[in-house]
């Protein structure tokens, strides 16, 4: 099945010129890898967070958002994840895309120039129109108000 395609303008900043554009690892990947646009390697110590530049500016079309998410391998193997996951990039943001990483392991982790540090998805965002009501007549569900572990372990 062919996926819908949209054009998104992207600009490489001077410190990101030699890095690849965000790209899909496989034909069916949902997210595109983002690369660390660092001049020098940095050490991300346990429980430390750092804002890592990607060297790109993107113009997300109106009606879409960018979602910055962790890479599963970094999280599973090294405890490195995106702190505000998913990080939202609004369609009117025109600054450099940066990734807020945190080290949840007990070992320091070195981030080098060109490392794949996160992934980005460009997803549709509908405009919500709230219908403010006095009484809620929605049909009952099996879950109702259950949350925070109510559906089992």
Swiss-Prot record:
Ligand binding (substrate): 71-73, 84, 88-90, 98
HAMAP family cross-referenced by the UniProt entry: dUTPase_bact (MF_00116)
SUPFAM superfamilies: dUTPase-like (SSF51283)
CDD domains per record: trimeric_dUTPase
Biological role: This enzyme is involved in nucleotide metabolism: it produces dUMP, the immediate precursor of thymidine nucleotides and it decreases the intracellular concentration of dUTP so that uracil cannot be incorporated into DNA.
GO molecular function, one term: magnesium ion binding
Associated pathway: Pyrimidine metabolism; dUMP biosynthesis; dUMP from dCTP (dUTP route): step 2/2
Recorded superkingdom: Bacteria
GO BP field: dUMP biosynthetic process; dUTP catabolic process
Keywords: Hydrolase, Magnesium, Metal-binding, Nucleotide metabolism
Protein EC: 3.6.1.23
Family: Belongs to the dUTPase family.
Reaction(s) catalysed by this chain's protein: dUTP + H2O = dUMP + diphosphate + H(+)
InterPro entries linked: dUTPase (IPR008181), dUTPase-like (IPR029054), dUTPase-like_sf (IPR036157), dUTPase_trimeric (IPR033704)
Annotated source species: Wolbachia pipientis subsp. Culex pipiens (strain wPip)
Protein name stated in the entry: Deoxyuridine 5'-triphosphate nucleotidohydrolase
Cofactor (UniProt): Mg(2+)
Entry annotated with the keyword Transcription: no
